[in-house]
Amino acid sequence: MYRRKEAEKILSSNPDFQPLYKQVYTVLVRRIAEGVWRPAQALPSEQSLAQELGVSQGTVRKAMDALATENLILRRQGKGSYVAEHTQEHILFRFFRLAKPSPKCDRIIPQLGSESVKRRLANRMERSKLQLGKGDQIVEIRRTRQVDGSPRVVEKIILPLKLFPEIDRQKSLPNTLYSLYQSEYKVSIAVAKEELRAISANKNDAKALGLNPGAPLLHIDRIAVALNGQLVEWRVSRCNTQDLVYAIEVN
């Protein structure tokens, strides 16, 4: 636990003006990132945090509201606030957008088909995407994913080996990797930044997805960012969205 003077130093160390609740938010995110509070662990009460940080309870509540809005914590009525855990349900809600067309746009997580994993040196593009140095190693995971038994997605996932040591030696990798990152490597994904565009299937895509070359695909380029701001995963997905949609909720 941070002592009061240490917390006050953190709150006063920001050279640029930030609202007080934003400074409290930054302190709380840092503690989650550093493992002071583990996934699924209850956070101290708002009153306790306010006393420790030397701010009002309302300021802490506003910071907690921001954490909840970003799905970094979960609130349970009558029980308090908990660090978000990357369960399959949580991952589905936050990071997977493919859905079957319906009024509810029920999302799906495509199931794992084939998979290959290898370790190698990062190339120039990978170093640029993940802010790696020359000579850094990465793990490349290639997957096909299925919906109702039919291949729908080809994926290439690039991970910095220094963040995920020996991940390529795992006996088997789970369908949803974010839970593994959190439980085994203490890396919690805070944000996923995506770029989408329409492309035509090349010969490899067509063969993997059972399509004709030139068939339309949805190309999703995603960078996953950890709680501490570090870029931890580059994922490229090429999706056959026939009878599927990419669903987004805009508040």
PLM feature segments, named:
Residues 110-251:
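C-terminal all-alpha effector/ligand-binding and dimerization domain
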Residues 36, 69-78, 84:
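Beta-hairpin "wing" of winged helix-turn-helix
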Residues 64-65:
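Short, hydrophobic-biased segments on the C-terminal half of alpha helices
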Residues 1-55:
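Extreme N-terminal segment that seeds HTH/winged-HTH DNA-binding domains in transcriptional regulators
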